[in-house]
Amino acid sequence: MIVIDKECEAVSRLFAKKSVRLKVPVGVKSENPIFQRKGSSFNLKSLREYQPFDDLRQIDWKLYGRTDRYYIKEFYEEENERFFLLVDSSASIPIFGRDYYLCFVASLAFIFLRLHFTLNMLSFTNRLESSCMNIKEHRAIPRVLGFLDSLEFNGRTDLVQVMQTVRERYQPTTLFLFSDLFDRRLTLEHLQGFRRVFLLHFFTPFSSLSLRHSEIEVEDRETRQRLLLPNNPVARREIESLERQFLGRFYRSRRGYHYLQLERTKERVPFYWRILETLYD
């Protein structure tokens, strides 16, 4: 059973009065004089054409009567972003800890829905596996939990291919990637093309492992290959050096790029707070 952190309700209330929404309305390109009227309420709103995912109740029927076209009126406080949550469901994730991982994703999604963001969730291995799209309002949290609970965690990771597919198919503005990043080919260049990326790295450091024998048998959950390694100071130093090289790819300062490293021993709530502070900055 996936449990949402109890602090999420309080965290979402604290940020509810802030705004990360668009500061200016979306312009409607039209020569119809109705959009040029001075002193009318139209100058205070964003107007856009109706799209299939919109609620029919949001259609401005008075405007339809004047223009014979369907428009949605959005007040400043109603405009929000659509976040894409890309969830790794490959076989290596349970090594980190399935419960911690799913709790984190579910809790962050809960907060976003409480703050009236729209979510699109995609799971992946070496390809996109499943989706749960256009999730709105906190009443839809059962959809999030059902989606996460259905993940099977098998198969290999191919982040390079998946990121390319997401970029070409969906063109998201803000992307949250939840993964252990088990793809040595992945670099920050593969994250270009997204205006804002949150890379949430679920990481198990080598130093946290309790190793008591002189040799270690390591199994790659994704390939099912086994490797026998010596457990001595020289071998440990070499592994830790490779680990630092691996992590070094992600410690970059770049506009719109945010890297957070999570470990099973770390509290989750401070990470929710950091993400929200970044969004509301």
Locations of regions flagged by a protein language model:
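Short, surface-exposed recognition loops or helix-turn segments adjacent to catalytic cores
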Residues: 120-136, 147, 156-164, 179
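An amphipathic, basic-hydrophobic helix/alpha-beta surface used to engage anionic
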Residues: 1-133, 174-176, 184, 190
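Structural motif
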Residues: 89, 177-182, 203, 263
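Von Willebrand factor type A / integrin I
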Residues: 1-26, 30-35, 189-281
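Von Willebrand factor
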Residues: 139-174, 185, 201-204
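Long, highly charged amphipathic alpha-helices
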Residues: 103-107, 143, 245
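Alpha-helix C-terminal capping segments
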Residues: 93, 162-170, 186-194, 250-254
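Short, electropositive alpha-helical surface patch
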Residues: 137-146, 253-259
